[in-house]
Amino acid sequence: MTQDIIDNIAAEGISYYTPAQVPPAGTQVEGSTKLFSPLTIRGVTFPNRLFLAPLCQYSAKDGYANDWHLTHIGGIVQRGPGLAIMEATAVQKVGRITPQDLGLYDDGHIEPLKRITEFAHSQSQKIGIQLAHAGRKASAVAPWLSGNAMAVKEVGGWPDDIVAPSAIPQEEGINAVPKVLTGEDIGVLKKDWAEAAKRAVRANFDAIEIHAAHGYLLHQFLSPVSNRRTDKYGGSFENRVRILLEICEEVRAVIPTAMPLLVRISATDWFEFDDNLTKEFPESWTVAQSIRLALLLADRGVDLVDVSSGGIHAKSAIAIRSGPGYQVHFAQEIKKAVGEKLLISAVGGIKTGALAEEVVQSGIDAVQAGRWFQQNPGLVRAFANELGVKVRMATQIDWSFEGRGKKAKKSSL
């Protein structure tokens, strides 16, 4: 009597057994949408254009990733985002947003992150990491404790050691006045960003994103609201964007040629759209400047600009006109200007598959969702169902919806 040999094949290159995922979760197997079509950036192909945006978890001790980070990312990657980007991860200890933020400022941080990337790769998924520095917004407490309070020394904070382009606090009377970064400090910062990028490569990430948005350090350099420097890193547009361009060059030089490099920016501080705030802040970061910056980033080896907005000042939130896809039009303006020279992704209020498909059909290359993935790790499948197409999840999940394999035939004696 002969029997067919049917094997639950193992994923290749993984230190433990787990079934191979062929094709990967997130692959469109029936129907046709642009949202679930593949996107190739340099040497990496993403199965679809719905990405997981970075979501800070405020759950680390001394910068080290743990099981919370593994399960947070793991439950989502099993269900197939095109790319999962890990949260803002500090390039310097004083660059953490809170004492509980992730870090890549020490070699010891690599191994816990490798555990997460190995799991993602066991699922044939792509995973990136966002490298960040909070600047004057550092030493905060977790947002569920307070929307603006600082973490004091007694709870591991460093309110006396926060840094910024200029001695201007995020919120007068709430945040400490930051120390001004010297030219020497900026040189160290650039080196530390490059070192963190090298550690990200050693941790086996597939892509790197540089965080220059939401009022954190690099955005603080970009915006005249927070940058009053008189040296080569302040004043003119060319000077204010200099540090970001230099960091992009440093990072691009130390990562593999085939690795995608992303940059997240705030397209605007929002003050340009409010007459009262324009009077209070006559100079701010604007969409027009973001368009100029995007073209310069393309020349520095950046592959994709992830377009968000706001965060530079407590009053930024007052001006924001929220709603479905409330900042997508900024991404569309930038994409129209850069054309095929640069990939652009949109984020913010993209809550439905129909809206996500509409955005990519408009010419945007990818969309990102954050909180909606956190609420529903199966967002990829939910959007696919809404659009009437079939997209795979991990085999262990998918079969319970798609049915068992073919039954074995009785053998002849």
Swiss-Prot record:
Organism placement in taxonomy: Eukaryota, Fungi, Dikarya, Ascomycota, Pezizomycotina
Enumerate the residues binding substrate. Y58, H211, A212, A213, H214
Q: Which UniProt keywords apply?
A: Flavoprotein, FMN, NADP, Oxidoreductase
- The EC number on file is 1.6.99.1
Q: What happens when the gene is disrupted?
A: Fails to produce aflavarin.
For this protein, the record's SUPFAM superfamilies field holds: FMN-linked oxidoreductases (SSF51395)
The reaction(s) annotated as catalysed by this protein in its Swiss-Prot or TrEMBL entry are: A + NADPH + H(+) = AH2 + NADP(+)
Name the pathway it acts in: Secondary metabolite biosynthesis
InterPro entries per the UniProt record, alphabetical: Aldolase_TIM, OxRdtase_FMN_N, YqjM-like
> Needs which cofactor?
FMN
| Similarity remark | Belongs to the NADH:flavin oxidoreductase/NADH oxidase family. NamA subfamily.
Q: What is this protein called?
A: NADPH dehydrogenase afvA
